[in-house]
């Protein structure tokens, strides 16, 4: 499948670059591509419900089982809209931001939504201290998604109580694991689980999602970089712990910057020399030093 999240990342990157450098000429050049990207994301809503539909393998977790209205893609698109609007200051974009924010907050955790997106599934949704990974026609995918939840913290979605409980959950999980970092998704899917066949068959070349590795509960420095970024203002000491953990993994084998690690054993997995592993450390470190980003 194609990658839905690349559009949002492009917009976030351009807007933050413009904000940092004040290179308005560059932004002017990129404005039309940005607007085309936002228009395409609107088209991928399919029924104008303010939630983008993402095919399986349609984002960074390209061999995982999430599909449908994936939470990570919704909050990433919201971040892109907010970044763009801080430069453009558009009433139209402001209204879209409000609608997208409302439908996210009302549908990805149990509560008192009067008009849930998936009424039958929402009725049986159990309360958890984090945002659900996805909604699709079959119901909710309720695993913990560290990347999506980290971006949600960055954007301050949910009320104070929800965010407090969210961080408590994430910290309890992080501290319970060998590497003292968050896994990409949790719990791992095992061969005896109902979803195993779906996971096992979703690979193009070779199967990498054994339990505790890759997207199936593996630890990614890049993902933890965004978690550290999201809590750096409120909990700088915790952010510092996470940065130290990221640097420890990146420095394996003479700074080989491995893609990810086995959460259970701590062994390096994935390919070497990944720029995104280095980027996770940089963004976490700079955030904890007071560097601000559009959000």
What is each model feature region?
Residues 1-48, 70-78, 163, 220-231, ...:
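Aromatic-rich carbohydrate-recognition surfaces in CAZymes
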Residues 49-55, 59, 67-70, 76-198, ...:
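Catalytic cores of carbohydrate-active enzymes
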Residues 191-237, 282:
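C-terminal substrate/ligand-recognition segments
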């Amino acid at each position: 499948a194609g990658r839905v999240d690349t559009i949002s990342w492009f917009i976030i990157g351009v807007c933050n670059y413009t904000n940092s450098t004040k290179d308005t000429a560059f932004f002017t050049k990129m404005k039309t591509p940005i607007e085309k990207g936002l228009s395409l994301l609107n088209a991928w809503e399919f029924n104008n419900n303010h939630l983008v539909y993402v095919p399986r393998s349609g984002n960074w977790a390209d061999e995982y089982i999430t599909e449908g209205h994936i939470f990570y893609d919704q909050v990433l698109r919201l971040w892109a809209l907010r970044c763009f609007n801080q430069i453009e200051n558009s009433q139209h974009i402001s209204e879209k931001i409000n609608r997208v924010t409302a439908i996210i907050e009302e549908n990805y955790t149990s509560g008192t939504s009067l008009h849930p997106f998936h009424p039958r599934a929402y009725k049986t949704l159990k309360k958890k201290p984090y945002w659900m990974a996805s909604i699709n026609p079959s119901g909710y995918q309720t695993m913990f998604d560290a990347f999506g939840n980290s971006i949600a913290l960055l954007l301050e979605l949910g009320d104070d109580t929800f965010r407090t409980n969210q961080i408590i959950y994430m910290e309890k999980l992080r501290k319970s694991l060998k590497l003292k970092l968050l896994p990409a998704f949790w719990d791992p899917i095992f061969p005896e689980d109902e979803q195993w066949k779906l996971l096992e068959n979703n690979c193009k070349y070779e199967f990498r999602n054994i339990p505790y590795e890759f997207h199936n509960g593996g630890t990614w420095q890049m993902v933890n970089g965004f978690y550290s970024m999201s809590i750096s203002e409120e909990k700088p000491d915790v952010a510092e712990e996470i940065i130290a953990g990221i640097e420890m993994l990146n420095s394996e084998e003479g700074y080989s910057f491995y893609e990810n690690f086995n959460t259970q054993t701590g062994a390096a997995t994935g390919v070497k020399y990944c720029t995104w592993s280095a980027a996770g450390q940089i963004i976490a470190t700079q955030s904890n030093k007071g560097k601000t980003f559009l959000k």
